[in-house]
């Protein structure tokens, strides 16, 4: 039997298992769910709505033409875009008491992400509250400012008990037991 030649040490690091995460902790594009992609496109559309003041129909048409939209859950995208824009004032009213600053001082990216989170917590009851929080934190890590994800997490984590009290209490009770 012949022995396998040994590789010199230090020539190549051992292969790491694939986790679907990049070195920064963000998920790789190939590992994102259809709904995660829908949230990304909704974020882009809501950002355009806040910053560009474009009409929802123009934003919708533009977003659907972007590369990769075909891989997104278009129904969830429609729900988020229409819901967040139609209920912007109500969503802001939910979020405002939890903020430590004015909306004018919050990045439009974080503002849009918090709209998505508040809307999903309130209307998308098929999505567990922790998934809503995690998805919004991931969006903030990928698209927001340096510590924007911490702010988004704090605000939405404070909002969740008022919108999903039974689910949050049951979930938090399990972790303490």
UniProtKB/Swiss-Prot annotation:
GO terms for molecular function: RNA binding. One of its GO terms (biological process) is transcription antitermination. InterPro entries: NusB-like_sf (IPR035926), NusB_fam (IPR011605), NusB_RsmB_TIM44 (IPR006027). It comes from the Bacteria. GO terms for cellular component: cytosol. Keywords: RNA-binding, Transcription, Transcription antitermination, Transcription regulation. Residues 1-36 are annotated as: Disordered. Pfam families: NusB. Belongs to the NusB family. Involved in transcription antitermination. Required for transcription of ribosomal RNA (rRNA) genes. Binds specifically to the boxA antiterminator sequence of the ribosomal RNA (rrn) operons. PANTHER family: ANTITERMINATION NUSB DOMAIN-CONTAINING PROTEIN, N UTILIZATION SUBSTANCE PROTEIN B-RELATED. This is Transcription antitermination protein NusB. It comes from Albidiferax ferrireducens (strain ATCC BAA-621 / DSM 15236 / T118) (Rhodoferax ferrireducens).
